[in-house]
Every structure is written in structure tokens, then in C-alpha cells.
A protein has these predicted regions:
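Short hydrophobic/glycine-rich mini-motifs in sensory/regulatory modules
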Residues: 163-168
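Positively charged n-region of N-terminal signal peptides that target proteins for export
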Residues: 1-4
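A short acidic-to-branched-hydrophobic micro-motif
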Residues: 74-106
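Signature of long, low-cysteine stretches enriched in small and polar/charged residues
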Residues: 109-161
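N-terminal targeting sequences that direct proteins away from the cytosol to non-cytosolic compartments
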Residues: 19-85, 149-151, 169-198
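Short N-terminal secondary-structure initiator segments
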Residues: 21-38, 97-120
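Bacterial N-terminal signal peptides
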Residues: 7-16
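Beta-strand elements of well-folded, non-transmembrane domains
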Residues: 92-94, 145-147, 174-176
Length: 198
């Protein structure tokens, strides 16, 4: 009997840390994409450069700029015939604003814990990547949804620059990508957002 109790205790010791990790929604951050003004021929072939103030970002070449898709639309929004949605907006940062890291944690929490009044829609995967383009720090939160939003991926790139926080949202369905465009290229496209010094 003592042997069974000891085995049960050891089992609980191994399982408890795994359970705590399963409910922990703190994003794992890793650094990538140091831009340093590098020319990307492959990205230039499928994207066009747009501006929102000093914010320089890429959209797919065949996309059309749209307005009024949602009641609270602001910034610039683009959509392709394949349903790829690209939306850039900005807001001022003041003393009451949370940090960039806290902002991303809030986005992750909002996306991974649904409201109790709506149908449960949980991502099957999320990840947070730290992006450094010419010394300007951005954080990219990526969400891959399961049922009922199966095959949908959202990416949200958040950047602080000169007292302004910029958001770039990219939304697409993995089974409806434009011809010849890969998910890796879309990820690279959104992470390439930088600032014009002109």
C-alpha cells in the first residue's frame, strides 16, 4: 500500500507543473527579423509599399484599399479578392498607456479567453515574436484558430514609435491564400513594417 501511495505522489509531482504550464497564457517571446535596410526581392515581387504617417508597411499587390467595412474603422484597410485583410491604425501613447509587452499580453489574453456570452472560439496555436527593424522594437502576436473559425489565422504587429503605438492586423484563411503566396511570406510581409525617415 505504501508503494502505491508513493507512486501516486510521484505522479502528481510530475503532472502538476505540466498542468500549470497548460493554463499559463504568458507569451513566449523570441527575437527575429533584424531589418537593417536589406532589399528583399522575393517580398517586392508580391507586395506594394504603403504609408500611414511615418509608418511604412507592405500589402499584397492585388489588394484594394477599403473604407467603412466596420463601424469603427480608422487608419488604412486593404483587402484582396481572396479575403486577405490588412489593417493599419495608430493611437497616442501617454502616461496612462500600458507598456508594449503588457499590450501584447492583453491581446493574447483577449484572444485566448473568450467572453462567456459568445460561442467558444479558441485558437489552436498562438505565438509571440519580437521583431527588430532597424532598432525599432515590435511584437508580433500570431493566432491560428480552430472551429468554428477553422483555417483562420490572425497576426497583430504592435510597434511603439515617437509617442505613438502602431497596429498592423493581418487576417487570412489558410485554405484560401492567393495563388503563389505562402503563409511564411505573409508573416514576413507584416514583420517588414518599418518607419520612413524622409
Amino acid at each position: 500500500m505504501k508503494r502505491y501511495i508513493m507512486l501516486l505522489t510521484l505522479g502528481l509531482c510530475f503532472v502538476a507543473p505540466m498542468l500549470s504550464q497548460a493554463v499559463d497564457i504568458r507569451p513566449i517571446i523570441h527575437v527575429t527579423n533584424v531589418h537593417n535596410g536589406q532589399y528583399d526581392e522575393e517580398l517586392d515581387a508580391i507586395t506594394a509599399t504603403k504609408f500611414y504617417g511615418p509608418y511604412q508597411f507592405r500589402v499584397l499587390k492585388d489588394s484594394v484599399e477599403t473604407k467603412g467595412e466596420t463601424k469603427d474603422i480608422d487608419g488604412r484597410a486593404f483587402r484582396t479578392s481572396d479575403g486577405v485583410f490588412m489593417h493599419v491604425k495608430a493611437r497616442s501613447i501617454d502616461n496612462t498607456s500600458i507598456s508594449l509587452d503588457k499590450e501584447i499580453e492583453k491581446i493574447v489574453k483577449d484572444r485566448t479567453i473568450p467572453e462567456p456570452t459568445v460561442k467558444m472560439v479558441l485558437p489552436i496555436k498562438y505565438d509571440v515574436t519580437e521583431v527588430d527593424n532597424d532598432g525599432v522594437r515590435s511584437l508580433l502576436a500570431e493566432f491560428m484558430y480552430s472551429w468554428p473559425l477553422h483555417n483562420r489565422t490572425d497576426m497583430v504587429l504592435v510597434t511603439d514609435y515617437e509617442d505613438t503605438r502602431y497596429y498592423y492586423k493581418l487576417q487570412f484563411y489558410r485554405d484560401q491564400l492567393p495563388n503563389g503566396v505562402r503563409i511564411e511570406q505573409l508573416r514576413k510581409m507584416i514583420m517588414d513594417a518599418q518607419f520612413s525617415y524622409k
